[in-house]
């Protein structure tokens, strides 16, 4: 998908039609890239991150989300500056900063390939490292502007960015949670929720108690999203949740794809201006391509070294039983290294470099090349690395879902009769709902047995699941027949198009109930 999207941008930029001449200049002001794309993308990815798992592995996540980013940025910059001829330090540093963070959206593509605990760790790391990256980016731009990089200033920027961002995120999350509880219309609800990440982001960025020491919008968005996600079951009405999730999934998918398209659109211009950059700074094209490969390899090596050394230090200092349960093998570290994909965030940082920064086109070219290598080569190697590591199949989430459903059905079963009598429902309705609950409990119990034991599951359980599959097929084909009748009525002009849409929605909801939840990531 990454290659296809960048190729689409290239096609748009190269269309030789006079009416499309302005497409070559398609783009957004650099500072707008981060302000538009990051808040929404991070808000959605935070919603899909397990807070429980993140708390369990908080120490490693914080180290990877802060120290590893700083380490990677400066190692890449040092290698490019010292050995690869990128003799402008600020250019090497900006490239290092852009390539330092892993990407939460890219990590989401690994669902089903890695254990849920690993996915959660990678997602949480990616969310935190975005905040670290933007602070480093601000420092790198100061260096590009001729300022010296002072340790005290850098430390203050990190401290206040995370402190102010966390406080603003909590405040915005608390206020938004109170307000959304009173919004009943799904459209109004989703419009309101879409404003939350922007409010958190811009409010935090505007708070600057000391010069240069402002809050992190990224941290504010992540904290607000975590708070709202945790309080969601208490304040989100079911219809708002039902209609909202597909919208969020679609918008974030389009936004992430748009970053790749924007890079593709700007590549011809970047390559055109690269001639001047190459000549002015003595970069040869072969060297520019070599810089891409070396920067990618260094990003992988830096991640592996940091993870290896950090884990060994933690093991030496913490020998508690809890820590022993979280330990990973050497092969597991290799998998974590290759799973650190670069993606949309790196592109957003590169596109956000101000136009007056020397060698901006070179920076975009290098970062786009490394992201492509990461997405394509790393992405292709990762399944092989996972198989080599022999990571066992993780059924933890599936087991928890089945256990939770069984517990919910069991503990709520008696309430059917109580509530029915309380509201005066006829006995036959109470009995029908009770029978449905018993049937659902039986189905979940047998489904869990078949998924867990496979061919070794009890014969009765396998027989019931086979019958359930036939029932699902029957219901789906019956719905298909109903839709054909509905279309015939529309074609015969017996019903209006609006009537067709209304009945279609009823049939679609029924089919969604039969098929069950769909993975949106």
Protein language model regions, located:
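Transmembrane helical cores of multi-pass secondary ion antiporters/exchangers
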Residues: 1-400, 486-506, 510-521
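Cytosolic C-terminal regulatory domains/tails of membrane transporters and channels
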Residues: 391-521
